[in-house]
């Protein structure tokens, strides 16, 4: 416990909260700018098991904001490099990897063993797939995203049917939304958004209350805004939740 001794005096965490963190299994979708920051704090804070899901390789354009990787890692699988770095950071955490693009059927196999899912991917289609799978399994999950000088984060509770789901918030937005290579991303904003997601994750796992709604960060004005989200009674994802089919 010495490694985590700074957590122990904190009201609402203490030894029991740290044990809940230690006993938790988290799936992380995407190990890019957001995912690197999330993974570092989850592992350094003692999450028991972390499953990394990413099929991409390290490119030079990643290095400014994806802080688990180095120049010597170019061309290697991100999950491979991240696992090595995270194991060196804290060998007490079991890190495992999925190195292909995860689809709905993969998520329905991976997520049942998880206490929490974090989506740090860079596309709307993947987030919708995570939303569908977590709704079916009633698994809590965190959405985090960033672009330009803006970041977003939201903790979703599919086990609470009165709460909105991801599609309730974003509707039928196309998968042609702007991305970081096209619109740009200020490197520290990826870190701020990722560490904020790690905060939400660790607080949730430890049993601390976390604020509901969508939380939006604007680095240009250095302001956070929290938005209340209403459930859409006609949402095609959460208005008729199907039981999972796990093969």
Predicted feature descriptions by range:
Residues 42:
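Aromatic pocket-lining residues of Rossmann-like dinucleotide-binding sites
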Residues 47-90:
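Glycine-rich phosphate-binding loop and adjoining beta1-alpha1-beta2 segment
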């Amino acid at each position: 416990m010495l490694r985590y001794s700074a957590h122990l005096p904190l009201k609402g965490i203490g030894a029991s909260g740290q044990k809940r963190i230690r006993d938790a299994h988290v799936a992380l979708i995407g190990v890019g700018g957001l995912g690197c920051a999330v993974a570092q704090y989850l592992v350094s804070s003692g999450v028991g098991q972390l499953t990394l899901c990413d099929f991409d390789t390290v490119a030079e354009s990643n290095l400014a904001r994806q802080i688990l990787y180095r120049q010597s890692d170019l061309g290697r699988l991100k999950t491979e490099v991240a696992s090595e770095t995270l194991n060196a950071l804290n060998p007490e955490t079991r890190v495992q990897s999925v190195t292909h693009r995860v689809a709905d059927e993969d998520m329905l196999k991976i997520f049942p063993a998880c206490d929490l899912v974090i989506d740090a991917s860079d596309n709307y289609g993947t987030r919708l797939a995570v939303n569908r799978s977590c709704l079916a399994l009633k698994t809590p999950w965190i959405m985090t995203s960033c672009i330009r000088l803006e970041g977003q984060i939201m903790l979703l509770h599919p086990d609470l049917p009165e709460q909105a789901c991801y599609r309730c918030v974003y509707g039928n937005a196309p998968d042609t939304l702007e991305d970081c290579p096209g619109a740009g991303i200020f490197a520290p904003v990826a870190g701020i958004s990722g560490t904020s997601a790690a905060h939400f994750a660790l607080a949730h796992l430890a049993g601390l209350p976390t604020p509901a709604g969508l939380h939006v960060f604007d680095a240009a004005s250095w302001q956070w805004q929290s938005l209340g989200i209403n459930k859409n009674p006609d949402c095609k994802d959460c208005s008729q939740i199907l039981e999972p089919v796990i093969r």
